[in-house]
């Protein structure tokens, strides 16, 4: 099974998860089609990760909740303390380093993923406080818009309206590369004073289009996350991999929130 997600890929590209022995939950001494066998199948309790050793959707939800709990607590503290730009840089740089370590590590390290959530909380809390001061109410708008996008994309994926195909994956990865190149050009331009120091995002019209494209791209990457989580569960990925799945989901949601925050700020600054 191949994964396009750079966070989930190293774990879920492995083969052989399904060959794990989850442990017996029913009797196996009866013929496969015997009444006793069927009765055991119906009466057996639902398998959990504690009994099978495999990742379940409940595991992913629980780990995601833990990571976002840490992010919210640290972010709330950073917001309350009204920390300066230095802490914003520490948060983003620390988060970037840990994102790279966790993404390319073959070993799942929950402690590093929780630490990543803390750094992101520091960065997002500080940045959100700044945006809230410039555009009152923007943070609640961005949070609600991010949640709405998450729910909408999840519904579209679960209903089968959007399917992950090799072509879809190639298009998304190509779009990501293009977006990263534009981001680099924008950053270089900001140093040269383009867009009043905001780079391409400060250029009227173009900045709005880039922001909309960023929100759309981050939303579509949620689909890749959902697909890889489902494939990991179907392949019998180890329970520990639920941490990696939760981490990958958090990375995309943080990216989506930042893109939404930037889009709303551009829209409100043009009023």
Which residues are covered by each model-predicted region?
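A hydrophobic alpha-helical transmembrane-helix feature that marks the membrane cores
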Residues: 1-271
């Amino acid at each position: 099974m191949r994964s396009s997600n750079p966070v989930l890929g190293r774990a879920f590209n492995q083969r052989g998860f399904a060959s794990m022995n989850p442990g017996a939950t029913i009797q196996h001494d009866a013929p496969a089609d015997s009444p006793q066998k069927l009765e055991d199948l119906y009466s057996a309790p639902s398998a959990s990760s504690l009994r099978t050793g495999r990742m379940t959707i409940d595991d992913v939800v629980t780990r995601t909740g833990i990571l976002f709990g840490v992010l919210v607590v640290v972010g709330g503290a950073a917001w309350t303390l009204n920390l300066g730009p230095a802490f914003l840089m520490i948060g983003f740089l620390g988060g970037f380093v840990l994102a790279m370590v966790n993404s390319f590590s073959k070993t799942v390290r929950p402690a590093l993923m929780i630490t990543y959530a803390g750094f992101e909380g520091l960065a997002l809390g500080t940045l959100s406080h700044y945006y809230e001061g410039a555009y009152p109410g923007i943070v609640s708008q961005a949070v609600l818009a991010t949640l709405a996008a998450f729910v909408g994309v999840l519904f579209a994926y679960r209903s089968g309206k959007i399917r992950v195909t090799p072509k879809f994956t190639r298009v998304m990865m190509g779009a990501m590369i293009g977006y990263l190149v534009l981001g680099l050009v924008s950053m270089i331009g900001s140093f040269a004073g383009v867009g009043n120091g905001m780079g391409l995002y400060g250029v009227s019209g173009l900045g709005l289009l880039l922001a909309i494209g960023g929100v759309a791209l981050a939303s579509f990457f949620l689909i890749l996350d959902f697909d890889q989580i489902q494939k990991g569960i179907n392949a019998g990925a180890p329970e520990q991999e639920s941490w990696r799945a939760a981490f990958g989901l958090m990375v995309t949601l943080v990216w989506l929130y930042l893109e939404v925050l930037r889009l709303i700020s551009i829209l409100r600054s043009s009023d």
